[in-house]
Structures are given as structure tokens and as C-alpha cells.
Amino acid sequence: MTEELKNKKNNKNYYSQNKNKTKAEFQKPHVKKNQYLKLKTKLDTALLEVQNLKDLNETLKKDIESERQLNLAEISNLTKKYNQKEIEIQKYGASKLARDLIQPLEILKKVVNAPNNNEVVQAYVKGFEMIVSQINNVLESHHIKAMNVKVGDMFNPHLHDANEAVESDEYKTNQIVGVLSDGYMIHDKVLIYAIVKVAK
């Protein structure tokens, strides 16, 4: 059989075989194209959603990192404040106790410095002097020191409390003419102001 005859015969067979096929079966390539387009649209939509989720994920990561940095900064600030408060407590924690001790100490100093010719009393005064010295040493070990204000010093409102202003020919205006009680410092702060009389 020749090639031509075979082709004709095959074509006849094709037509005879396809006579019985329905219209829907002939539309399969078209249906497949529609399905492909639908699937492609779904895939594109899914890819877009994935990209949106990736973008959202990046945004959330940045937000979390920013929040973490803020929290670290806040923790650092709180730690600094806490450390500063702790230093202040260590430096100035003894202030209240020192104030309570200094008032009787000043009275004891006045007793020690009062003139006395009685030998028995002088023996007690020597004992009081030792006590005053020991208390001063304890105070100094906690960085609490007397100002040692003297008559003739200039009045300083940051260190002294003027109890009285008196007329004086001997002293200049604002010069201290009398010390009623000495002042005390704790580190760099005034613990107790010196109470003084000043010339006007």
C-alpha cells in the first residue's frame, strides 16, 4: 500500500472514529486553556499574598527590633537611675542619724569649751573631750565634717543660717560676729547649717 492510500485510509478512520464524539470532547483544549488561566490567576494571587506576608513579616521584624531597642534603652536608663540612687543612699544614707547625733555633740562641745577651774570637773571635761574626739572621728569616717566656722569669717547663705544681725564697729557688714553652733557637711552637701550672728 502506498503512502497516499494509507493517509486517506487513516483520515477516513479518524473521521469515522470522531463521528461519535460529543461537542464537549472537541472543546477540551479550550477548557484546558480556561483552567490554565484560572490556575495561573490563583497562583498569581497566592504569590502576591505570599509577597504581602513577607513584607508584613519584615515590617513586624523591624517593629519588634525597634521595640527591643527601646526596651533596652529604657532598661539601661532605669539601671543608671537605680545605680545613681544607690550611690546617693551610700553617700547620704547616714544623714538623719548624723543630724540627730550632732545636736547633742554640739552641746557637749560647749560644755567642754566652757571655762572651769574645778579640778574634779576638769577630769570629767577631759573624758568628755575624748568622747567628742571619738564621735568626730566616727563622723569623719562617714564623710561628715564640721565646717569650723569662726568669728570674722564672711557670711555665706549657702553654708550659714543668720540667727541675728547686730551692729558692730569691729566687724564689716556680713562678717560673722558670733557662732551659736557649727555647721556640718556630708560629702559635698550641707548637712546642718552653721547658726551665726552677723554684723550689719
UniProtKB/Swiss-Prot annotation:
Annotated InterPro entries: GrpE, GrpE_coiled_coil, GrpE_head
Keyword set includes Cytoplasm: yes
Keyword Chaperone: yes
Gene label: grpE
Organism: Mycoplasma capricolum subsp. capricolum (strain California kid / ATCC 27343 / NCTC 10154)
Complex and partners: Homodimer.
Swiss-Prot/TrEMBL keywords: Chaperone, Cytoplasm, Stress response
Cellular compartment(s): Cytoplasm
Span list, region Disordered: 1-26
Organism lineage string: Bacteria, Bacillati, Mycoplasmatota, Mollicutes, Mycoplasmataceae
Protein known as: Protein GrpE
